[in-house]
Amino acid sequence: MSFQEQQCKQPCQPPPVCPPPKCPEPCPLPKCPEPCPPPKCPEPCPEPCLPSPCQQKCPPVQTPPPCQQKCPPKSK
């Protein structure tokens, strides 16, 4: 058996690990030509609606009882 035949029967070796590709220099971060202005509202937001004073002060409206209960019975 020749030397080449012995090499042929040996298991194949894994290929060498390639180093990760390197950039020649780090990529620069994207730059804005000027800082972005903060978003502006066309006008200030309206305040949330508050209940009117009457709703806070007045008691809930009660339906009046029927007239038959208010009026005294007719006397003959």
UniProtKB/Swiss-Prot annotation:
Coiled coil: none annotated. Sequence repeats lie at residues 21-29, 30-38, 39-47. It is found in: Cytoplasm. Pfam families: SPRR2. The keyword Lyase does not apply. Residues 21-47 are annotated as: 3 X 9 AA approximate tandem repeats. Keywords: Cytoplasm, Keratinization, Repeat. Residues 55-76 are annotated as: Disordered. One of its GO terms (biological process) is keratinization. Expressed in uterus. GO terms for cellular component: cornified envelope; cytoplasm; nucleus. Induction: Up-regulated by estrogen in the uterus of ovariectomized animals, with strongly increased expression detected in luminal epithelial cells at 6 and 12 hours after hormone injection. Cross-linked envelope protein of keratinocytes. It is a keratinocyte protein that first appears in the cell cytosol, but ultimately becomes cross-linked to membrane proteins by transglutaminase. All that results in the formation of an insoluble envelope beneath the plasma membrane. Belongs to the cornifin (SPRR) family. This is Small proline-rich protein 2G. The lineage of its organism: Eukaryota, Metazoa, Chordata, Craniata, Vertebrata.
